[in-house]
Amino acid sequence: MRKYEIMYIINPTVLEEGREELVNQVNALLTSNGATIAKTEKWGERKLAYPIDKKKSGFYVLTTFEIDGTKLAEVESKLNIMESVMRYIVVKQD
């Protein structure tokens, strides 16, 4: 299993309770695919470098985890259909 980081941006129109639920859903998605979550950091709402879907800000979340690389594609495909996740990136740690 390798270490990865995922940074995702939640739509700013999602309320606080909805954000917490979405963070829990993403963490549950990771663990259901065999990931071990090391930590989740909520960076809060920040200005975007460029507008995404006519939004100028987003709520940033960074999660560090370990997962088998073959399971990562399934996680990414499910993240693609989550409407409240505006963007995400998964990076392998050294």
UniProtKB/Swiss-Prot annotation:
**Cited Gene3D superfamilies:** 3.30.70.60
Q: Which GO terms describe its cellular component?
A: cytoplasm; ribonucleoprotein complex; ribosome
> Quick one: a GO biological-process term for this protein?
translation
Which cysteines pair up through disulfides? They are none
Q: Name one GO molecular function term.
A: structural constituent of ribosome
Keyword line: Ribonucleoprotein, Ribosomal protein, RNA-binding, rRNA-binding
What Pfam families does the annotation carry?
Answer: Ribosomal_S6
Q: Which NCBIfam families match?
A: S6
Query: What function is annotated for this protein?
Result: Binds together with bS18 to 16S ribosomal RNA.
Q: Which PANTHER family match?
A: MITOCHONDRIAL 28S RIBOSOMAL PROTEIN S6, SMALL RIBOSOMAL SUBUNIT PROTEIN BS6M
State the family it belongs to: Belongs to the bacterial ribosomal protein bS6 family.
> What's this protein's name?
Small ribosomal subunit protein bS6
| Species, as recorded | Fusobacterium nucleatum subsp. nucleatum (strain ATCC 25586 / DSM 15643 / BCRC 10681 / CIP 101130 / JCM 8532 / KCTC 2640 / LMG 13131 / VPI 4355)
